[in-house]
Amino acid sequence: MEEEHINQRPSATVEEYSYSEADFVFSGLSWKERRQYAEDTSFLSPFDKALQSKWEQKMNEGLFRYPLRNLQTKILPGSLSYVAQLNIQRSINRRKPEDIWSIQQKFNPNQFNYNKIKPEEIVFQMIRSETEHCVDSDKVHGSSVNGMGTSDCKSGSTHQRCCILECKGGCTLVVINVSPLEFGHVLFMPDPSLCLPQILTEDLMLFGLESVLLSAHPGFRVGFNSLGGFASVNHLHLHGFYLDHDLFIESSSSKPLCPEMNFHLITHFPAPSFLFYTDGRNLKSTAQNICKVTDFLVAKNIAHNLFITRGSNPDTGNGSEGRNGIRVNIWARKPSFGAKEVSAFNVALCELAGHLPVKNQEDFNSITEDSVIDIIHNCLLADDEFTQLSLDLVEYLRK
């Protein structure tokens, strides 16, 4: 039961969700198995049930900028099975993105950041317990909650008064995205008062991998947009959401680059990507290797997007139905600094993976696989630049 994981202390305003490795769902459902459940939610994990119930509660309380019900969805004809969804309200009502001009841009306390969110937007904070069997425990383990209060920003010489929850060490805050892309859309962030810029860290990457394993739903996705890759807030966070549709990229074929690291290259897709694969048993080393790549891209001032999803082992071939592992796709791309939003969709983590939140009815009606590919190609690195980057990354990872 999800209630066994949640602890709300009398003095706290935010609940804790405690978990351990015993809660990971290593044997994921295939999409065929998922469809057999239809509307039956008994397959969901305690994490799924807790997250979804809290998210729906906050939707019913009117804490989002717009209600998100059943989005009009269609699968585009073609070999790539793009999932297009009409989400007009997000394009109209979302918060104006921060002015970004560099992948290495420092945190700015004067811009909007997550120290300024409403306390009611917090779902819970997640704490990894060292207890081996969190599910069977009568007591939820984890750090205590300080509650809401005023604190100083902890980022070097930056000073900012902020009204936020101070997380104990090792916790991750789960906050609703008030302009949701899909059902269950939340943000995962380390202690906001650390005031970290939008540059991926090993700890947050590790949590992203763990969160996918905590979910029993094959459609639970986690992602990251770098600065210049359509990150709208320069304050460290991941996106998490449910998309109840199979994506081509979950089982697409790949070429091994560093087999010893499960590092591959996907080229049979409009947006070539670097791919890490794990069966879930080596999460820490996988997170470290992923951040070696993203740190390399940051150092080279290359914008990037990252998408974490359950998927098949790339060594088993194209089109496998198995979803027992995790695929992490990383796209290096042209930066979007000052880009005008003139296309049917922005090209960020969802769109590169094959999920297309479309801004208006006209584009939704007319969109085709070919038009999607044209839009995406305009955001990619030149072929020779990408080829050289691939060679440089392999050399760097093998040092």
From Swiss-Prot:
One of its GO terms (biological process) is glucose metabolic process. It is found in: Cytoplasm. The active site is at H237. GO terms for cellular component: cytoplasm. GO terms for molecular function: GDP-D-glucose phosphorylase activity; guanyl-nucleotide exchange factor activity; hydrolase activity; nucleotide binding. It is an enzyme of class 2 (transferase). Its EC number is 2.7.7.78. Belongs to the GDPGP1 family. Specific and highly efficient GDP-D-glucose phosphorylase regulating the levels of GDP-D-glucose in cells. This is GDP-D-glucose phosphorylase 1. It comes from Xenopus laevis (African clawed frog). The gene is gdpgp1.
